[in-house]
Amino acid sequence: MKLTIPKSIKSNLLGYTYFAQLYADTSSCIAESLLFDFNECEWLEGNLCAVFGGILNDLQHRGNAIAFINVSDRMRGVFSRNRFLNIVESINLPNTIQSTTIYYNRFFIEEEKDIKRYVQSELLDKRLMPEISDLAKKKILEAIFEIFVNATIHGKTSEIFTCGQFFDRHKPPYVYFTFVDFGRSIRTN
């Protein structure tokens, strides 16, 4: 099955609607070969790799083979820097404290220390993060960790997917830090 990725996917209603539809369209795929065609794709906001990665992970758990085709050099660079490309290729570029990316990762709830270390190094210790007190950092870390815990308790999920992006060239600068789980929804609970 060939799936065409649209020209631009952003963190807005259209972007999230696209991924919801992609999830629905592929929900019955079992042991298939899925080609994600990026020929038309010029931009996918890095933080949305958490959503896309969760969908791909679900597909792989159901025995599907995943491949990306026609990925532009620009998109390959984005996917390489945030380690998202590791899902389909064996590439591992270092992510440094100077990087604008918060690399893609998948966590299991029992990885509490890893989750906290990730948030600390990928978000709170980045040079692009505004100067804040140690107490503020501690409170932010606690609040973010609570999101992980709530997803597992209320969502009955075992995995959390994360990715993010600093947009330091915008005025004012901002960051998107995305958490995704595929557990039970608020409506279901």
In which residue ranges do the predicted regions lie?
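Short beta-strand-loop-beta element adjacent to the nucleotide/active-site pocket used for signaling
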Residues: 166-177
